[in-house]
Amino acid sequence: AELQNHRNELKGKVVYCNCDDPTSSNFVRYLCDNFNAYGLKALIATHYIDPQTSTQKPVKLTVSRADNAEGFIRELTTLEGDGDFRSEECIAILNSADIVITNPPFSLWRDFIDLIIASNKTFILLGTIHAINYQSILDGVKAGKITTGYTNFNKTLKFAVPEHYDGKTTSNTTKYAEVHGICWWTNLPVTNRKPLQLSKFYSPDLYPKYEAKNTKGKPTATAPVDAINVDRVADIPCNYDGLMGVPITIIGQLDYNQFEVVGKLNNGFIGDKKVFSRILI
């Protein structure tokens, strides 16, 4: 559903899925099924295989447009290396692509997004809302260049995991884990954001400022930031022009014409209570 909103941006482009086994990835299957519908120029998919646990070599799938506009050509080749997205082999493929669409390993998400941004590539990535903790994502959000996607935001989804991972097991013996706060991240335009309709009014009693305390709750000379605390996005006061700390879920509703993101607060205190991480607007 997410990709349907980016048809114009996908048309005529080389898409790279660099964390996807061509034989089993739902991303690859979907893009192959919709190769002509989206007007892709080419689709490339590679994946990682740990050489310590498997003697198999990872494969590379290349799908390209046939001379017949109604068809396409599929080619499977063996990679020389282990298929790690950070390898020279996979970075060379990345450099030849236009758009990266994949579900990076959550444990390597920071490394992945840093590489993609450094490569100056367009991306549509499945991740979690907590990626806002990564400096490269926060910088992109502050600059208005990165945001979450169109699709229903902040969901819990199940992901298949290797046998040695902690997780649950389905009826067909596939092990999976539940991951909370799932969302899409992209640097493509997301045009469905509208200004929030705000109806609450500021008062010091309802919107206290953060205490002058350090990360352990000990008193300090100054507060970490001169901002009021807002516990819910719906409670943002309509008549306050100063700095506000709001829930990170605002990213999924943010209209950059209404608010400017200036930073993030990780360890704010209201009285003796430590509040959840806040986006500063």
Task: List where the protein language model places each region.
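Class I S-adenosyl-L-methionine-dependent methyltransferase catalytic core
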Residues: 1-281
